[in-house]
Structure formats: C-alpha cells, structure tokens
Design a protein with these regions (language model features):
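Hydrophobic transmembrane alpha-helices and their helix-loop junctions in integral membrane proteins
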Residues: 1-190
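Cytoplasmic/organellar membrane-interface segments at the starts of transmembrane helices
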Residues: 2, 132-134, 187-259
Length: 259
C-alpha cells in the first residue's frame, strides 16, 4: 500500500540492508556461528525463492506481485552469502545492485500504470499493449531483466551466484535454478494479464510523458551497462569480499575438521 516513492526506496535500498549487514557484520564478527548456520541459511534461501514465487502466482495486485518477486530474488543473495565462495559473494554484490535497478523500475512502472487505469488489479487490465506506446515494452524489458536476461546486470549476478555456490551446495543451486523457471512463469503471466488479452475498457489512455520515459530508460541503461561491463563493480568489491570470504572459509574449514 506504500506510495511509489516508498516502494522504490524499499526495493532499491532497504531490502538490501539485511544482506549488507550479514556480509559486513555477521560473517566477519561471528564466523564460527555463521559457519554452523550456513547449511540452514542456504536452504532458507531456496525456501525464499520458492515461497516468493508461489505467492507471486497467487497475486492479482500487480504491485504486490512485484514485491513478492523481490523476496524471491533476494533468496539468491542469501545463498551466495553463506556459500563461502568469493565468486558467489561478488555475484551477490552485482545482484543487489541489479535487482535494485530492475525492481525500482518495475515499481515505477506500476505507479505509472495505476495513474492511467486507477487500479492495480490485473483482472481489470488487459488490451493495453497497442493503446499505450512504450510503457508495455519497457515493462516487458524490466520483467525479463529481473529474470536474468543476458546482457543485463541480473544475469551476471545470478550466474556468478550459481557458479560460485555450486561446489559448496550442488542441490541447493539446482533447486535455486529451478526457481528461475518459476520466476519466468509468473513474470510473463504478469505481462500477459496486464497488457495483452481483451480490453476491459475503451477509455483513452495517456501516453508516457517524456519525464516518465527518460526516468525508466536511465535505469535500463544502467542495468545494461552493469550487464555488459560489470568489471568496475567486481574490482571495487573484490578486496572487501575477499576478506569476508577468508574469515568465513577459515571457520568452515575448522568446522569440517572438528566433525
């Protein structure tokens, strides 16, 4: 029920605060406790992916669907944090940045859609693709980007997370990858229900204003730039994530030797 600005703040910044706290404080300050908790945390990540996906399936409110999909995608970050892999940790950093951009854009587009239709109920939408230039196409791009469209930052982040976490927990990664399939289903269903099908109303709809279009296109450019050239982000986070990985890997090795 939050306004669009509050939803963008939640998706782009506040949702990442917990992950930042885990990487910055929980793992370095409590490596042994984190190592004990790691298997549980990784399975909780899988649960978050599946739970968020199934809740997204059940939604008729488009904004609530985007919110639950954000919960699902953050499950990948939780898996990466407790994998003990440097590659996965760097993937988590990229994923948090990319998800912040894509989720923020989707919330902005939901707000723009609400301003024109005065409803967020997808059952009252449909038949909009040909009547609203730009907005449906941009929504489709960001929905695909959130799934990990190659060429976007989400693809780089999720790929690094899955590749880095696989040696530590193969079954967790396999199930998490299946969650991407669920994500594709509910995202494409959202686009189909909101923009395609028979029109529920023939009332004229206002096209996107230049300010609205430039705002989301700017986010799209940043997302593509992060996907095509993520090296500056990886270089910037390399030293910090290496330190976190060293502390956590040492605790994991010690725990394995004791057992």
């Amino acid at each position: 029920q939050a306004p669009t600005a509050g939803s963008v703040d939640l998706a782009g910044i506040l949702l990442k605060t917990a992950a930042y706290g885990l990487m910055r404080f929980a793992l370095p300050l409590f490596p042994n406790a984190s190592a004990e908790f790691a298997p549980i945390a990784m399975w909780l990540g899988v649960f978050a992916i599946a739970y968020g996906a199934f809740l997204s399936f059940a939604q008729t409110d488009i904004k609530r669907l985007v919110a639950y999909s954000s919960v699902s995608h953050m499950g990948f970050v939780l898996i990466a944090i407790y994998s003990g892999s440097h590659i996965a940790l760097q993937g988590a950093v990229v994923q948090m940045m990319a998800h912040g951009l894509s989720a923020a854009a989707l919330f902005i587009l939901c707000g723009q859609l609400y301003e024109r239709l005065h409803t967020r109920d997808m059952r009252e939408m449909g038949g909009i693709w040909a009547r609203l230039p730009w907005l449906p196409a941009v929504s489709l791009f960001f929905a695909a980007a959130a799934l990990g469209l190659p060429g976007t930052g989400n693809f780089v982040g999720e790929f690094l997370i899955l590749i880095g976490s696989f040696p530590a927990a193969p079954w967790v990664v396999v199930l998490a990858a299946c969650g991407l399939v669920l994500g594709s289903v509910y995202s494409l269903a959202m686009i189909h229900r909101a923009y395609f099908g028979p029109a529920k109303s023939e009332a004229p709809l206002q096209a996107m204003k230049a300010r609205e279009l430039y705002m989301v296109l700017g986010l799209a450019v940043l997302l593509i730039l992060l996907g095509v050239y993520p090296q500056p982000v990886l270089d910037t986070s390399a030293a910090s994530m290496h330190g976190v990985q060293q502390w956590f890997s040492g605790a994991l090795t010690q725990l394995a030797s004791v057992r």
